[in-house]
Each structure stands twice: as structure tokens, then as C-alpha cells.
UniProtKB/Swiss-Prot annotation:
Record protein name field: Nucleotide-binding protein Ddes_0972
Pfam families, per the entry: PapZ_C, RapZ-like_N
GO molecular function: ATP binding; GTP binding
Organism expressing this protein natively: Desulfovibrio desulfuricans (strain ATCC 27774 / DSM 6949 / MB)
Family recorded in the similarity comment: Belongs to the RapZ-like family.
Amino acid sequence: MSTATHPRPEGPVVETAAPMPPVAVCIVTGLSGAGKSTALKVFEDMGHFVVDGLPASLAPEMVDMMSRPSMSHFKGIALGMDLRQSNFLDEINEALSDLAAVNIRPMLLFMECDAQELIRRYATTRRPHPLEREGMGLEASLLSERNSLSPLREMADLVIDTSRFSIHDLRRAIQKRWSDSKSKLRAIRVNVISFGFKYGVPREADFVFDLRFLTNPYFVADLRPMCGKDKEVAQYVFEQPHAREFCVKLIDLLLFILPLMETEGRYRVTIAVGCTGGRHRSVAMAEEVTQALRQADYPVTLEHRHLELG
């Protein structure tokens, strides 16, 4: 039996790019005043692309845009939707069906809160409930919205009741649920800055450490033109009796306090290490601290602010 042969196509073989994985989508909805806007800000801080007040009918188009390679640096997309659209429930059901057809299954997050707490929040902010514009009082608006959204609440993948939540409690709840378990890096970002006191302390610093108790390499003629990134300067700094001990204790302090700050919902902390001119001692110490924090899986940025001035 003969075997048919097929000629190879002429011209270069073009390799097609691997398809991008489905984008992670979270639809945030719920009762007005229950924390939807705050939740969306948390998603934004966590690296999601956020759109608030999006008509449900536009969700498939928005998700399609986010599936492009140019948007791949975002961790996902969070869409805020509410009852201000008259046909909201019909549109969101249709949008979910359209997304399911392209293998995208959004997480539906519903923000809940008890009536008395909502009344207190509206009294504090003095903002009108969206349905009050239709001639209803606040309590009637809250009840109408709750009844209208009850089918959506039943559909939700996750309901967060913020009745007894502070803003920080809500932030922690969302961080815990949507943390990237595949990444080794901690959620809190650390900025390390070396600086010179004679040029001013960085205003954004959360912690400031003064290294002027160490002998200044500036007064060693061979070291003066160098900086703390040079091996000779770093060796001179850390051979001093208390320099290495200070460095170890500083790193221990940071490794103790950073997880606590992360638990409280902090996303970044700035550590400033200063000496007189910001060229020798502070630079050497900042380099050492940065290396230790990176080894502990913290995402760290390092800036030598006054290196060229010192």
C-alpha cells in the first residue's frame, strides 16, 4: 500500500505565539456604602486594572482588551458594578454568559453590610444613596436595593460583610483572599534610600537611621574619591567595631517589623540610611541591607539619593 506524501509549504515557517492564559476577572458589586469603592482601591494597589461604574454590558469588551499582551503586567482586572443601571441584573447575567463562552469565569464579590451601619455611614459622609434620587428616603432606598440585589448575592462566589469592618480590616480580607500564592515575594514593597544629612532627610521616609557614629571614609585620602559601592570603602566601613553589629541588628529589626506592617495592610515602607554626605557609609550600609531583604524575598528598590553630591 502506497503512502501519500504531502509537499512542505514554501516559504518560511511562522511560529505563532502561545495564547495568553485567561485573564483573572473579579466583578465587585453589592450594597451602596458597603465598601465597594474601598475594595476596588485595594485591588488597584495589588496590581489589578480597575474600572468602577462600568456598565455590565461592556464587561466582555473590557476583558477582551485586558487579554492583549500589552496589558499582561496587570495581575488581573477588577470591575465595579452597581444597581444604577435600570436593567443591571439582566445585563450582568448576559455579560457572564458572554464571558463563559470564551472560557472566562469571573469571581463575583458581593459587598454586604447591615442597615443600621449603612445609615450611620451615610449620615457621616452626608452623601445621597443612589436610589434617593428617585424620590425615596434613605431607609427605603437601602431596603429596595437590598431586595433588588438579593439574586446577585445568591450568585456570589464570596460575600464580605463589612458591618464591623474598618477600612484596614477590609484591606486585609481582600489581600488574604487574593494574595499571589505562587509568588515567593512578600506583598509589602521596601524602598531603601541612602542619603546625606547635609542635603536633607528624605521626606517619604518611614524609618531614618543615622550612621554618623561611624568613622568617615571621606577623611582617608585613598577612599575619598570612591563610594560605598566600592569594595575598599565597604570593607573600611564594616571593619569598624560596631558597624557589622549595627547592620545585623538593623536587619533583624526590619525582618521583625515588616511582616507586622504587612499584616496591617501596608503596601510599602521606606527606609532611609544617612551619613554626612551620602556617599560612603550610608551607601555601604544600604547595599548590605538591600541584599539581606532580597534574600528574605522582599521586593526592594534601592536609591542612592545623594551619591553624586557627597
